[in-house]
A protein has these predicted regions:
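Active-site C-terminal subdomain of aminotransferase-like
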Residues: 1-95
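Residues in well-ordered beta-strands of folded domains
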Residues: 2, 19, 56, 102-104, ...
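Generic structural signal for hydrophobic core residues of well-folded globular domains
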Residues: 58-62, 105, 149-153
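Conserved PLP-binding catalytic core of the aspartate aminotransferase-like
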Residues: 89-115
Length: 157
């Protein structure tokens, strides 16, 4: 099980939580870390001591009930974004257990307006953007994005 502290919990820098079984951990490949002069099992590339403290502080501050409510809202909004993209015929991809929705990249104007992250992947149809549906993403903000995407679809006709 893995969870992004950055993309789900909103921590201001990349970090994550990874839970595994002892068998998987014990059978993981080791990597030679030249600057440590040692072989190590590496699940993540960071050894920051601050990020786990931020993660712990957030977990304790918000609490189980708070995170349960936030997770429900995040996934509700993720499903809403997907249903709206489907409704306007805009291609998208998403793992049902993820709050990241990847979709065909819109115009540069829309990318700038919403500060969309962009990339390319031939397997998914070329130029892409994605939205990470977090606590600050609302149905109103999704509706505004969808309206702009719909306008692009109409202007393409």
């Amino acid at each position: 099980i893995s969870v992004s502290g950055h993309k789900f919990f909103g921590i201001d820098s990349p970090c994550g939580l990874f839970i595994t079984t002892r068998d998987v951990y014990d059978n993981q490949s080791t990597y030679d870390i030249s600057y440590l002069n040692a072989n190590m099992r590496m699940i993540n590339c960071s050894r920051s001591g601050i990020e786990p403290l931020k993660f712990w502080w957030l977990m304790k501050t918000v609490g189980d009930e708070g995170w349960t409510e936030q997770a429900a809202r995040i996934f509700e909004n993720t499903r809403y974004l997907k249903s709206e993209l489907k409704r306007i015929g805009w291609p998208y991809w998403n793992n049902e257990y993820s709050n990241t929705v990847i979709f065909r990249r819109p115009s540069a104007k829309v990318v700038r307006k919403y500060n969309l992250a962009c990339g390319e992947d031939a397997a998914f149809g070329g130029k892409l953007s994605h939205v990470v549906v977090m606590q600050h993403v609302t149905k109103d903000s999704i509706d505004r994005l969808i309206a702009d995407l719909r306008d692009e679809t109409i202007s393409d006709l």
